[in-house]
A protein has these predicted regions:
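NTP/phosphate- and nucleic-acid-binding module
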Residues: 1-193
Length: 193
């Protein structure tokens, strides 16, 4: 069971059927379906353990545990979908600070370099703050902001969804940095720790 916002719900059912089902099948079919265990030197009808798991319920439990409606300073609200980065549908959003001065073109150039490696989108509409909020709400783990400094020194601002921390990184470091964080291997390693 999993604690959903609307109460505990079953995600997986595990049922110990003992040997009832196979015994009934043996009884009505007239076939011997006993298993001979050479170690014990005896025959018996095996026990059956039946499991059933719904992908839809499992996915719903991930969504419910990832959703957060934060109250920020100044009364603002921030909806964040803290999906594990490996499960996020969009890994990176590339955002030109403004829609002029060559920034959209540079953003598309960066997008083209990333899109072969993982699902990436460009977001140009509204203020940069609204774009960050929009990407937070859909679970995008990283945002890349292209600004006027990008045109001067080939660096961008890389923003992390969960911490909202921002760092200047060279364009060449976006792919290795993000790839490491959004890989399934990274997720499995975090689970194992």
């Amino acid at each position: 069971e999993f604690q959903m916002p609307f109460g505990f719900k079953e995600v997986e059912g595990i049922h110990s059927r003992t040997n009832f089902d196979l015994s009934q099948h043996e009884k009505y079919s007239g076939k011997n379906i006993k298993y001979f265990d050479p170690e014990l030197g005896e025959s018996y009808v095996p026990y059956v353990i039946e499991t059933s798991i719904g992908v839809d319920r499992m996915f719903l439990s991930v969504l419910c545990s990832s959703y957060e409606d934060q109250q920020l300073e100044g009364g603002e609200r921030r909806v964040v979908l803290h999906l594990p980065a490996a499960l996020a549908p969009v890994k990176v959003a590339v955002m030109p600070l403004v829609r002029k001065d060559g920034l959209p073109e540079k953003a598309r150039e960066i997008l083209d370099g990333l899109r072969l490696h993982f699902n990436t989108q460009i977001d140009e509409k509204d203020s940069i703050g609204k774009r960050y909020r929009r990407q937070d709400a859909i679970g995008t783990p990283y945002c890349v902001t292209v600004d006027h400094q990008t045109l001067e020194d080939n660096t961008v601002t890389l923003r992390h969804r969960d911490t909202m921390e921002q760092h200047r990184v060279p364009i060449a470091e976006i792919l290795p940095t993000v790839s490491k964080e959004v890989s399934m291997a990274s997720l499995l390693q975090k689970i194992a720790e």
